[in-house]
Amino acid sequence: MEADGQSWSGESVSGPGPGGGGMIRELCRGFGRYRRYLGRLRQNLRETQKFFRDIKCSHSHSCPSSPAGGGAAELGPAGDVAAAPLPAGQLSCISFPPMEEKYLQQIVDHLPCILILGQDCNAKCQLLNLLLAVRVLPTLKLDSDESCKLRRLRFTYGTRTQVSLALPGQYELVHTLASHQDNWETIPEEDLEVQEDSEDTARVLADLEVTMHHALLQEVDIVVAPCHSHRPAVDVLSDLANDFLPVITYALHKDELSERDEQELQEIRKYFSFPVFFFKVPTLEIIRSSSGRADSERSPLSGQLMDLGYLSSSHRNCMASDQDCRAQSMLVEQSEKLRQLSTFSHQLLQTRLVDAAKALNAVHSHCLDIFINQAFDMQRDLQITPKRLEYTRKKENELYESLMNIANRKQEEMKDMIVETLNTMKEELLDDAANMEFKDVIVPENGETVGTREIKSCIRQIQELIISRLNQAVANKLISSVDYLRESFVGTLERCLQSLEKSQDVSVHITSNYLKQILNAAYHVEVTFHSGSSVTRMLWEQIKQIIQRITWVNPPTITLEWKRKVAQEAIDSLSASKLAKSICSQFRTRLNSSHEAFAASLRQLEAGHSGRLEKTEDLWLKVRKDHAPRLARLSLESRSLQDVLLHRKPKLGQELGRGQYGVVYLCDNWGGHFPCALKSVVPPDEKHWNDLALEFHYMRSLPKHERLVDLHGSVIDYNYGGGSSVAVLLIMERLHRDLYTGLKAGLSLETRLQIALDVVEGIRFLHSQGLVHRDIKLKNVLLDKQNRAKITDLGFCKPEAMMSGSIVGTPIHMAPELFTGKYDNSVDVYAFGILFWYICSGSIKLPEAFERCASKDHLWNNVRRGTRPERLPVFDEECWQLMEACWDGDPSKRPLLGIVQPILRSIMDRLCKCDSERPSRGLDDST
């Protein structure tokens, strides 16, 4: 061994050559930058995986545990929890997609490694020496490719220079090498070669591992591929790609590729998509020559590589001019341009990081959108379910009372209906009775008499025939009395019940069954002869009389005439009034029974929903307070990583202003946008971090709109203020001034009314996206050079379903209900009303009622009591009425912005037209 602890990065290759400290420093910076950002990506991925594990654990029936029963969850192959799937419910779709997780895990696990391939081993060794700026490998003897037996070489960082043989990924071999025997500057050739006649298979397969105290090796390992005869390049690359991100270099020393070279490159391109850095190593003649090939000339090598698909006609321009373009293969034939390897590696590594950051942010954004949508669904469920239950109870009562009224008032009608039915059906009933075939009674064909028991059975069967036919006829006519109920409100009631029962056990829809029983009571009237009914007593008296007559006279012969006579006597003995009374009584009994059962079932359903809603509210709170903010912060970090990789950290210009939570700076150019405004925010605690992250997500999720300030991107500065804090830099569209400054300078009436229209349009757009701004005020309305307005600062902007009821905003623009914690998007209408007061006044002076308040608390108390800005003499009547409507204390009475907008247009048309024709009687021009 030689030079223990000595740094090699300061030495140079003896003789002239392209290698040197400048190139090494650039490569070190590039690979060091990659490792730094890869560490942030790895940390974000780790926290994302933990987030999804926590979601599964908190919303599964049982949490997964380690086999030993410890606290750590058991991880699957991609870092996911090997747990049971989430139960069906609101958050069951929240999970890390397996393919994305596997891809990202591979990205963060595979560190970069420079792989040196080449036309022959001499060229590969020469390129390695140039990269390290040290002649560590011999290059003069390895000139015969046929006799070359170079084994795979691996150069890594170490505090001491060491050379050893090791099986890849296994163990080091204890062998004495030539480099161990004496001091050396160049590794002895016999250590580099494979001794094929050796009986030790491990020694034949082993790599030569070299550790060196070198700046470049501290950032990236270097692997030199073995000679072609020992192992094909595609196999070497395949092994390396399993554990590393290969930065492939290909050393050339001839003016053209051989047939074997082309075949090798075709195989690499067939199986891998990595770009390749082709470099022509300098020969002695090239080094001595002061002239080289001009860049514009196309060399034979360039033509061959273009034919193979490695190069395109624009590859040089892309590499030279656009640092953000995707990595492409590159050919460098001028030895002094080896430092372009740093550009090539930068683009390769950056492409890798940007793709990973995009994939991770896509997962974050998708799941965050699901959270927000689920929050809306849960909020709606919490609001609508109690109303549905109350509606169901009310409508069922109406249905019950309507049917009961029918039963009470229809008795006389039913009596007439029964008489009419009997008269209509009499002949038909008599014929049916005469032709009736008795069951279980043998009637002699020769006219012989039968016994008393058979007579009783025949009479009973005739009676049942008459009653069943009558029952069917009466029921059919009674149906028409309740059909209108189905059309009026039963359909709505049934749909309401179905929606309530969806979340309950689908096998027990007893509430709907009882509702059907209530409605169908009329369909199932039974004119039967059960014991205890007046109809039963009446008909049994008639039967007794017949039986008594049969007892004292000769038993009758069962003939057609006898059957008609029995049927006639049964019909004549029926009392229509008693039947009607019996039917109505039966109807009421069934109705009462079903009504009571329905009420009991509804109470049971309500109790079930009460427990479910309690769990839903807990979950809704968890989504708003924990899950969504936590995921939003991860999303902010992944998106900021993507932005800083693509566009670098922005440069702060002069300070433009300060707000409650940050400072706004001028930023001349960033990401192709100029000029920009940069808002630096230093969140003081976790809550502000979460709020900022959610704000960023809402802003980035919004489609571009001409009435909203564009957000170009974000960067997290981990060294803000000299490293004392972490700041989020939000890069936005820069406008001319804010409305406060504009009113102070003076704006014409037409301009001010146009600004009001622009603000309404912007707020309407936010509301259409489900967002509430909550802080509409003069300083949050920015003006461009044409004095068109755009809304900015969505710091308090949230979807209604994500609002926790916190008191936010600027005191004089805050609606009274904000202090109760229960509010909706009408708070923006209130704030616009106050803003419109300033717009109509044409000045920035506070309303007198607010100016007299000594403190915020005093102001808030006055607003709660109904204090509003005063009417100024310059106000137009219609403008004043619009202001008053907007700041009404009752949120439900405030106009919708869709109504405000046309009113503003008509005001503008009227006042500005009047102003152009004659002096205005209302609003004065403040310019």
From Swiss-Prot:
Keyword Repressor in annotation: no
PANTHER family membership: DUAL SERINE/THREONINE AND TYROSINE PROTEIN KINASE, DUAL SERINE_THREONINE AND TYROSINE PROTEIN KINASE
Every Protein kinase domain range: 650-904
Catalyses which reaction(s): L-seryl-[protein] + ATP = O-phospho-L-seryl-[protein] + ADP + H(+); L-threonyl-[protein] + ATP = O-phospho-L-threonyl-[protein] + ADP + H(+); L-tyrosyl-[protein] + ATP = O-phospho-L-tyrosyl-[protein] + ADP + H(+)
Family matches, as CDD domains: PKc_Dusty
Name the UniProt record assigns to this protein: Dual serine/threonine and tyrosine protein kinase
Origin species: Rattus norvegicus (Rat)
Record SMART domains: S_TKc (SM00220)
Protein encoded by which gene: Dstyk
GO cellular component term of the entry, any: apical plasma membrane
Keyword set, alphabetical order: ATP-binding, Cell junction, Cell membrane, Coiled coil, Cytoplasm, Kinase, Membrane, Nucleotide-binding, Serine/threonine-protein kinase, Transferase, Tyrosine-protein kinase
